């Protein structure tokens, strides 16, 4: 059916109200077709000391995405920003992202997350692909890719994720039945957080944690709390010079290191268990780590390092889009009903072969793309340019840090007509691959891309064919930058059984 449902809210505010603003991207059309030097790129200026005070006061920079969005409004589709002695160039057009992708080397580089690197160095631990550049990154990445991104790997882990998604559905049904009103209103974020940890841990280590019930064991609860703590403290440490934060943020550093220590110990125990199973004749079930151990192409230190990063990286990147998708579907009941009809029509085929969810649910896949357009988990993608490039008629030299703003791209009316409206159908009608960059691109795309897609598709498929999702909240959810883009508070959602 034709989907014309639209949110009653203007998601691009407050910038649409600014009298000085213009449509994003107009500067490129007005610029003469002549090469300009790097120094001619419009510069965004802020007092460095005031910026530091703001970060200290906020314990991070919750409005970073909005600040950069406003800068695009003022300066056009490309600008540069000084971060100390480092110049960062910000861009936000799909054609620029495509040009950067085409110029990528076989081992693209980006700046490394300093607080995480500091923990590994202080503890004498190896680093995985998320914290590596150069030949070592490429060596690790080429050996992990087949077990995370290949069709063969997806075929292996889809039934595992489906099992967890079905268990979550049963958990939700019990909660609803236990309620005298025959419905359930809840803050869904913690449930989604636990679901993604449960599913990812099962795929990585072949072991269930038991996070879908009400009574978590103390070890699992500490594990969940430690992952939450890492996500909370990381942005407080990454936006200021490390020398300064080590002097004024010792409590935050300690919390971050203690949390990493606990997660590292937890992951190490699981990797060792898998190793012992492989050595004694083979694991009981397929898992990513069992494949890496059996293959023997990576050292145990490298397997431990990558297991740690895959565990930490599998949480908010999936749970936030799930919450925001359910929220938008609750605000757009016509879209929700169309998705439900699609899931009910595909129920038999997906039940027989869960992998069919990837092909038989095109509208649901479009819904996820639309959610990630409005609420990209990563505010921007980063590259350190390996060669000189001409971007928007400006010369940008090799070695420059480039940030591609996904938040502003998703709100650009020149790229997405009526960007303030929630219109999943737009993704059924377009082919631009560089308009959907949530999981990155090229050889450095998100390693957990396929797993995240499967986790989201199957969970939403099972929940939406069984429940109507409603909300009384009509206003926009305030999104804040906390290492990933997340809601400042999770919207209250109500689940009612489908009659």
UniProtKB/Swiss-Prot annotation:
InterPro entries hit by this protein: CYP11_CYP27_families, Cyt_P450, Cyt_P450_CS, Cyt_P450_mitochondrial, Cyt_P450_sf
A Pfam entry, by short name? p450
Which SUPFAM superfamilies does the annotation name?
Cytochrome P450
Would I find Protein transport among this entry's keywords?
A: no
Gene Ontology cellular-component terms listed? mitochondrial inner membrane
Pathways involved = Steroid biosynthesis; glucocorticoid biosynthesis; Steroid hormone biosynthesis
Q: Which UniProt keywords apply?
A: Heme, Iron, Membrane, Metal-binding, Mitochondrion, Mitochondrion inner membrane, Monooxygenase, Oxidoreductase, Steroidogenesis, Transit peptide
Top-level EC class, please? oxidoreductase
What family is this protein classified in? Belongs to the cytochrome P450 family.
Please give the function described in this protein's UniProt entry: A cytochrome P450 monooxygenase involved in the biosynthesis of adrenal corticoids. Catalyzes a variety of reactions that are essential for many species, including detoxification, defense, and the formation of endogenous chemicals like steroid hormones. Steroid 11beta, 18- and 19-hydroxylase with preferred regioselectivity at 11beta, then 18, and lastly 19. Catalyzes the hydroxylation of 11-deoxycortisol and 11-deoxycorticosterone (21-hydroxyprogesterone) at 11beta position, yielding cortisol or corticosterone, respectively, but cannot produce aldosterone.
Q: What is this protein called?
A: Cytochrome P450 11B1, mitochondrial
Which organism's genome codes for this protein?
Answer: Mesocricetus auratus (Golden hamster)
Lineage runs: Eukaryota, Metazoa, Chordata, Craniata, Vertebrata
What gene is behind this protein?
A: CYP11B1
């Amino acid at each position: 059916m034709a989907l014309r449902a639209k949110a009653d809210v203007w998601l691009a505010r407050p910038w649409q109200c600014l009298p000085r603003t213009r449509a994003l991207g107009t500067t490129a059309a007005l610029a003469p077709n002549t090469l300009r030097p790097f120094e001619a790129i419009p510069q965004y200026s802020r007092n460095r000391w005031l910026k530091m005070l703001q970060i200290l006061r906020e314990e991070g920079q919750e409005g970073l995405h909005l600040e950069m969005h406003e800068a695009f409004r003022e300066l056009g589709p490309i600008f540069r920003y000084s971060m100390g002695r480092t110049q960062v160039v910000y861009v936000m057009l799909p054609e620029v992202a495509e040009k950067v992708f085409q110029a990528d080397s076989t081992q693209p580089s980006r700046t490394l997350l300093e607080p995480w690197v500091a923990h590994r160095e202080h503890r004498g631990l190896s680093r995985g692909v998320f914290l590596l550049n150069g030949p070592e990154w490429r060596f690790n990445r080429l050996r992990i890719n087949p077990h995370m991104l290949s069709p063969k790997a997806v075929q292996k882990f889809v039934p595992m994720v489906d099992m967890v998604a079905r268990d979550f559905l049963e958990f939700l049904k019990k909660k609803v039945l236990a309620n005298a009103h025959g419905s359930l209103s809840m803050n869904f974020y913690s449930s989604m957080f636990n679901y993604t940890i449960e599913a990812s841990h099962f795929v990585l280590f072949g072991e269930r944690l038991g996070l879908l019930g009400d009574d978590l064991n103390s070890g699992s609860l500490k594990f969940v709390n430690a992952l939450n703590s890492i996500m909370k403290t990381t942005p407080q440490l990454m936006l200021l010079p490390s020398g300064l934060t080590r002097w004024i943020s010792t409590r935050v550093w300690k919390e971050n290191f203690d949390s990493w220590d606990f997660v590292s110990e937890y992951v190490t125990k699981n990797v060792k268990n898998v190793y012992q199973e492989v050595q004694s004749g083979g694991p009981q079930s397929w898992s990513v780590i069992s494949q890496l151990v059996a293959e023997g192409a990576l050292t145990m230190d490298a397997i431990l390092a990558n297991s740690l990063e895959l565990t930490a990286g599998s949480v908010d990147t999936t749970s936030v889009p799930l919450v925001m998708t359910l929220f938008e579907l609750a605000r757009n009941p016509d879209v929700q009903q169309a998705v439900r009809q699609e899931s009910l029509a595909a129920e038999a085929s997906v039940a027989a072969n869960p992998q069919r969810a990837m092909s038989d649910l095109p509208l649901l896949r479009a819904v996820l793309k639309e959610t990630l357009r409005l609420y990209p988990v990563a505010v921007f993608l980063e590259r350190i340019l390996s060669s000189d490039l001409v971007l928007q008629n400006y010369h940008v030299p090799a070695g420059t840090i480039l940030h591609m703003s996904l938040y502003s791209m998703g709100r650009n009316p020149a790229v997405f007509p009526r960007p303030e409206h929630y219109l999943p159908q737009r993704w059924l009608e377009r082919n631009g691959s560089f308009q959907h960059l949530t999981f990155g691109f090229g050889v450095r795309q998100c390693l957990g891309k396929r797993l995240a897609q499967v986790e989201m598709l199957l969970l939403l498929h099972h929940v939406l064919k069984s429940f109507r999702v409603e909300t009384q909240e009509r206003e926009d959810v305030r999104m804040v930058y906390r290492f990933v883009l997340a809601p400042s508070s999770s919207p209250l959602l109500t689940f009612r059984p489908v009659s």
